[in-house]
């Protein structure tokens, strides 16, 4: 077995070695970027201003599904629809006495908003329907 004398013998190539080589790599990269900036004369200033807030969307995006159950998810027609300001998204729950729940989701225009948030009996005996809307207050 060989033993090394002097400072080389006390170095242990481990995590510190990796850290120092990574730090050296970052230093070289920084020097190269500064030199390129000086040679080519292009300097990209850093924008320290706070970013402007995103504009309020003009449309409300609603989930649309023609037949959905909690157990199986959407079975028919899964996509999204856009509805203009003043309109809403609606989910119609159709339930029976055994707590089975079938849902229909869609967009609702201003004229159809009377359907929102009320319960009614279904034309089919033993079932009832509950509609639930969500809307967003749009800025004009």
Curated annotation (Swiss-Prot):
CDD domains: TFP_LU_ECD_Ly6G5c. It is found in: Secreted. The keyword Lipoprotein does not apply. Its main location: secreted. Residues 1-41 form the signal peptide. May have a role in hematopoietic cell differentiation. This is Lymphocyte antigen 6 complex locus protein G5c. It comes from Macaca mulatta (Rhesus macaque).
């Amino acid at each position: 077995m060989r033993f090394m004398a002097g400072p080389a013998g006390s170095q242990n190539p481990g995590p510190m070695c990796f850290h120092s080589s990574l730090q050296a790599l970052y230093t070289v990269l920084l020097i190269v970027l500064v030199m390129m900036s000086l040679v080519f004369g292009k300097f990209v200033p850093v924008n320290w201003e706070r970013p402007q807030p995103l504009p309020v969307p003009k449309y409300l995006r609603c989930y649309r599904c023609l037949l959905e159950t909690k157990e199986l998810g959407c079975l028919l027609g899964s996509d999204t629809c856009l509805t203009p300001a003043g309109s809403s998204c609606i989910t119609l729950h159709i339930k029976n006495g055994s707590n089975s729940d079938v849902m229909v989701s869609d967009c609702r225009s201003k004229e159809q908003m009377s359907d929102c948030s009320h319960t009614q009996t279904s034309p089919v005996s033993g079932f009832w329907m509950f509609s639930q809307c969500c809307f967003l207050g749009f800025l004009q």
